[in-house]
UniProtKB/Swiss-Prot annotation:
Name used for this protein in its record: Major immediate early protein
Keyword NADP attached: no
Pfam families hit by this protein: zf-C3HC4
Keyword terms, alphabetized: DNA-binding, Early protein, Metal-binding, Zinc, Zinc-finger
InterPro entries: Znf_C3HC4_RING-type, Znf_RING, Znf_RING/FYVE/PHD, Znf_RING_CS
A molecular function (GO) term: DNA binding
Gene name, Swiss-Prot/TrEMBL: PE38
Signal sequence residues: none
Organism this protein belongs to: Orgyia pseudotsugata multicapsid polyhedrosis virus (OpMNPV)
ZnF start-end (RING-type): 39-92
Source superkingdom: Viruses
Length: 307
């Protein structure tokens, strides 16, 4: 027997109940499966899970299944007829109580007629419409396979990818700007360092040139100092010992006796003061000048340490 049960072939009520109990026990022992039930009035098929509440009612007097919508319509039609009882539309048996099927249990329920204000027709229509919409609403698995759902999902993924691409582009732009700023700063620093290095190199060259000049001056000064030291030594030695000076003139020097006497006095005074032979020659040039004839002067200086 399929999961879709139709008890219309069985005429005996007791046998129908036994079949129903057996089916319920089989349903309870079986794993959770999808069950398709058909309303006996509207013939609409409803898919439910075997472990969930079944949205069907069955009269206690028979085994016909009715959906809630059809049961409510039965009571609504009976409300307009005084002292009318609700009967099964299939077997015309009066219905006193109804059985609702819950997981592993069967609950009996009874509808009580109230004399209060009736629900407006517009509200009833809206409630019935909402019930039908909820009942026929696509399941999550069916919605995932619909083209509109797939398109929305792809569109959402595309929007997310575009947003990520924009964020990445903005991040790259910021990094590029930061890199350009750092590069420009580095170039300026390198230029400044090169300028400073060139200035330092020029200063170093000037320092080297000045050092070489100072070294030459030092060498010249050292030479002069050595010569002066030797002269001082000679002067000190000359001052500590007597000096004999002999001056001889040739025949040309006798032409002017006054000049020779004057020159001789200068020679003695200079030799006694400076003890330098070059000074004697400069004095000769100063005294005689260019007017006199050249003459030779022999100056012999005897020091005690030359012996």
């Amino acid at each position: 027997m399929s999961s879709r049960y139709s008890p219309y072939r069985i005429r005996n009520v007791g046998e129908r109940r036994r079949v129903q109990e057996r089916l319920l026990s089989e349903f309870n022992s079986r794993p959770v499966t999808a069950v398709a039930a058909v309303c006996a009035v509207c013939l609409e098929t409803y898919c439910v899970q075997s472990n969930n509440i079944i949205d069907f009612l069955m009269p206690s007097e028979c085994t016909h299944l009715f959906c809630y919508k059809c049961v409510l319509n039965m009571y609504k039609n009976a409300m307009n007829v005084p002292r009318a009882a609700v009967s099964c539309p299939m077997c015309n048996k009066k219905v006193g109580t109804w059985q609702a099927f819950f997981p592993n249990s069967v609950v009996s329920c009874k509808f009580i007629k109230k004399t209060g204000d009736r629900t407006p027709a517009c509200l009833q229509f809206m409630l019935a419409l909402k019930t039908i919409q909820d009942r026929y609403m696509a399941t999550e698995e069916e919605a995932e396979t619909e083209p509109s759902f797939v398109i929305k999902n792809l569109q959402a993924q595309l929007d997310a990818a575009q947003k990520e691409a924009r964020d990445l582009q903005e991040s790259m732009e910021r990094q590029k700007q930061a890199h350009n700023v750092a590069w420009n700063s580095s170039c300026e620093q390198v230029t400044a360092l090169q300028t400073t290095l060139a200035d330092m190199q020029a200063q170093l060259d000037r320092s080297e040139a000045l050092s070489s000049t100072l070294a030459e001056h030092n060498r010249a000064a050292n030479v002069q100092i050595d010569s002066l030291r030797r002269a001082v030594q000679r002067l000190e030695a000359a001052q500590s010992a007597p000096v004999s000076v002999n001056v001889e003139f040739n025949d040309n020097a006798r032409q002017n006796t006054n000049l020779h006497e004057r020159f001789r006095s200068y020679v003695y005074s200079t030799v006694s003061d400076m003890m330098i032979e070059d000074s004697i020659k400069s004095l000769q040039s100063h005294v005689f000048g260019a007017a006199c004839l050249p003459c030779s002067v022999n100056v012999e200086i005897n020091f005690p340490f030359d012996e």
